[in-house]
Amino acid sequence: MAHKKAGGSSRNGRDSIGRRLGVKKYGGEAVGAGNILVRQRGTKFWPGEGVGMGKDHTIFATVDGAVKFHKGLKKRTFISVLPVAEAAE
């Protein structure tokens, strides 16, 4: 069976959907325990106080409070959640 394969443009035209990564809650925002703060591939952001990290490197709040981004050692950006009373100071 003689078949001629389709030309280029007919065989292209596929693209994967975006993964919806990035910062979900910004500095100063009020969050509750369990809220996702950042979805990421690898450790662009590191967990600080009041924050946990899932196996896919998702950073989430473990306490209620306000989000704070800050730089640490080795030029790492840490995300912390400060309890409301502490954040007001």
From Swiss-Prot:
InterPro entries associated with the record: Ribosomal_bL27, Ribosomal_bL27_CS
Any Gene Ontology CC annotation? ribonucleoprotein complex
Is Ribonucleoprotein a UniProt keyword of this protein?
yes
Q: Name one GO molecular function term.
A: structural constituent of ribosome
Stretches the record annotates as Disordered: 1-20
Tree of life domain = Bacteria
One short Pfam family name for this protein? Ribosomal_L27
NCBIfam families linked: L27 (TIGR00062)
What is the designated name of this protein? Answer: Large ribosomal subunit protein bL27
